[in-house]
Amino acid sequence: MEWNGRKIILDNLREELSAYTVDIQDVVRSAILDGIELGSYIEECREYPWRLEQIRLLIKEDLKEEVGTDLSGAMLYKIRCLHREGHNIEGLKKLLASGMEDEYAEIALDWHSKGYELKGLKISWIPRHLLDIFEKGLMAKMDMREFNTGVAYDKEYLLALMRLQSDGKSCKLFVDGTWDLKVLQLIEAKAGNLRPNEWAELEKRLRKDMDLQQVSELINCCKQGMGLAWIGENDVYTAKHLGYIRKAFEKKLDWKKLVGAGKSLTEIEEAYNSMLTEKGRVLSGRLHKF
């Protein structure tokens, strides 16, 4: 075995490694007998002979390429046990990032053994209080990468995002975690059944400083089939203004006369009532003909 530019054999082992514990020397002795090169790991495992032993066994069992040797002895042992039990350990080296804490490495191993789709998922980024929810999502075959941002979401916030994704909606707008929870829950509850084109229009007009009533009216407009193309991307309408526009559409009035974010509410109310009165006159005139 090569170590520090010198050749270690059984005859000089104790002398060459006299600065190391007997435990380290015994592991090296076993490695020499197995024909395994452990020289590059001796110093880093000076205080951890059991880890050195696990590296030796990992190499002996031809698992080094799949797993790497950056993990703790405890994790290397668990991986060897998984392999011995017949689990597929392909891809573990990439999954178990260098320096990953044992807690996260253990979770990664558990999820891998359960067959969850983990490709592209950075498990060490998941806040501890969200690990159980992430597992539920993985179990349901959801794409949890969309929420793998490192943001410490409130649990209810993440659940609302997951329900949106389940409805086929992109959550990109909301994954920064800064939206009001009640607004997000309203969007998830009311907009989940919007068609793709309606959802795309709604996304363009949603702003995180909107209140519940404004967002609710925007969704109502979408559901009425009005679309939202008439709203400029930088325009902000009050909930009451949107409500008058929607009601005008429902009553088949010339609702586009009410469009314009700069119009005052008084102006909007007068225009709406005027159109309503005019429609009443027209209907009344038609009835008199009969």
Give names to the regions the model predicted.
Residues 1-290:
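General marker for long, soluble alpha-helical cores
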